[in-house]
Structure formats: C-alpha cells, structure tokens
Amino acid sequence: MWIKSQHIKAASIIIGWLSSLAFGASAQNPVQADSAQAPYDSAIAEALSGTLVCYSAPRTTEHQWLFSIGGENLLDTYLSPLAYKGTTMGTSFRTERFTHFGAQRWTVRARYSLHAAYLASPTDNGKEWDMQLSGSGALLYNFSLYTGWRFAAGGALEGRTGFTYNTRNGNNPAQGRAAVAFAATGLAEYTLRVGNKPIRIRTEADFPLVGLMFSPNYGQSYYEIFSLGHYDKNVRVTFPGNAPELRWTTTLSLPFRKARLSIGYEAEIRQHRINGLKYHAWNHRFLIGYTRHIYVVK
C-alpha cells in the first residue's frame, strides 16, 4: 500500500521561523475592553448587524485564544509505512481588525498555532511524537448579503514548521518539515440576539493554492543534504495536485462576563506526495477558548 520505510541516518534539523507577518493585526493604544452588552461590540459586530460601513464605531481589534484536544492520524513513509494514531493537543491565537483604508470593507487577520501529538502504531509497539508550529497573515474583503450576516473572502500567506520523531527507528528517527504557501481563505458569520445578548456563529476555511515545501528525496539522508551538500530537489513547488490541504474551523461564541466563551470544532487535513514519499496528517479537534475586543483611539 505504501513504500517501504528507509532506514537512513538522520541529522537534526533546525528550521527558522517567520519572525513577523506583513499584516500588523495588533492594534495600538488600547483604551477599553468590551463587555457583551457594549453598544459597539466591535467594528466586526457592526458588520454582522448588516451595516458594513459604520464610521461612528470606535476602531477595534478582536483577539481570540482557543485551546484544542482531539485525534490525529499521521503517516510519513520516510519514517514508517504504517499510519500512527493518537491524541493531539494545542493552542491557537487569532487577531483581526479593519484596515485603515477601504471604508471598513477590508480586514486583516493574523493567526498562530502550536500543536503536539503522541501517537502509536497499529500494533502499539511503536510511538511517534509530532509537533507543528504555524502562522498566517490574511487580507479579506467583507460584504453582507442579509441582515445579521457577514461574509469575507481573500488571500493568506502562511508558513509552518515542525517535526515527527519515531521512537523505533535507530538510524532514521526523525523527519523535519518546513513549508510556505499562498492560500484562498473565506468566512461566514451570523449573529443572533437572545434578549440583548449577541450570539455569534462563525465558520471559516483556508485552502492552500501554491507554495514551496522542503522534503528529502526518496532514500536520501539529512547527512547528505546538510553535511555533504548534496541537493536533490529538496525544495519543491506544491499545489492541490500534489499537496491537497484544508483547514476548516467552526465556533460558537456566547457572552461571558467581559469576554465571550467560544466553543467549536476544527478539521485540518495536511497531505502531500513529493519526492517518492507520502505524508498525511488528519486532525479533528474540539475547541474551547475566549474572544475579546479591544477599543482603540483612531
């Protein structure tokens, strides 16, 4: 079904990470955190009410922290021909605000996440540790077709790095990963009110279109790449044909004191077939966290 595992001596790999994103989604000069009953819940909430252009609303930034737990199914034929399964846990942070241009039609969004998983082979005699760090910056155009709805679509530049460590492999214990991609992104939000309490349902998706990915070639060791300098198509172009990927997140946000309690579900599908190697990481996660808005001086 899958190609045989290559027992190759692997050197450790340290991969640099994006130090910052082009989109500065963090606001300056915060003056007040909102409550669920605030008259201007945020500029984004004004869009939810059906009025996208709201010049009287203070400029706001939305911050959301989410914590996750779920299951992961991982296959990396550089390490093993078997798919490993186990528990994944992680955290993510999202910040979003309207731009200074475009009459509050455009928003910028930054998102960062860190996930780790402990996995076992089908016979439970092999274990793997998996870690991924990712970040993205997006620019989205907002529009509303119906009262209470907000839609947005745009593009995102995203990058990620990580590794998988297999406890059974003596000569070939680890695989490092690094990739950047341009992705299409979109979201839909709906806000309803129960009494004077706003409740928001949000669903969003990211679909990478084209990018670059590091990968050793079939039968190639990290010693050959980094010590001997033997390059063998180790940076490859990715697109949906060889690396179909999708992240889909849905959350429900409920008023809770001066913030919002957010619960939801996330599916993240990462897979590729490059350099004669197959990889997939299928994740399903339960989410819980909180969302806040910070009012700022224009």
PLM regions and their residue ranges:
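Transmembrane beta-strands of outer-membrane beta-barrel pores
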Residues: 69-77, 114-120, 157-165, 190-192, ...
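Outer-membrane beta-barrel transmembrane domain signature
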Residues: 171-256
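Outer-envelope beta-barrel architecture signal
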Residues: 59-65, 102-110, 147-155, 178, ...
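Residues that define the transmembrane beta-barrel architecture of outer-membrane proteins
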Residues: 63, 83-91, 127-135, 149, ...
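Short glycine/proline- and aromatic-enriched beta-strand/turn motifs that initiate or cap beta-hairpins
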Residues: 28-109
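Residues on the lipid-exposed face of transmembrane beta-strands in outer-membrane beta-barrel proteins
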Residues: 91-99, 135-141, 155, 184-190, ...
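Outer-membrane beta-barrel "beta-signal"
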Residues: 282-298
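Extracellular loop and loop/strand-boundary signature of outer-membrane beta-barrel proteins
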Residues: 76-84, 119-127, 169-176, 234-238, ...
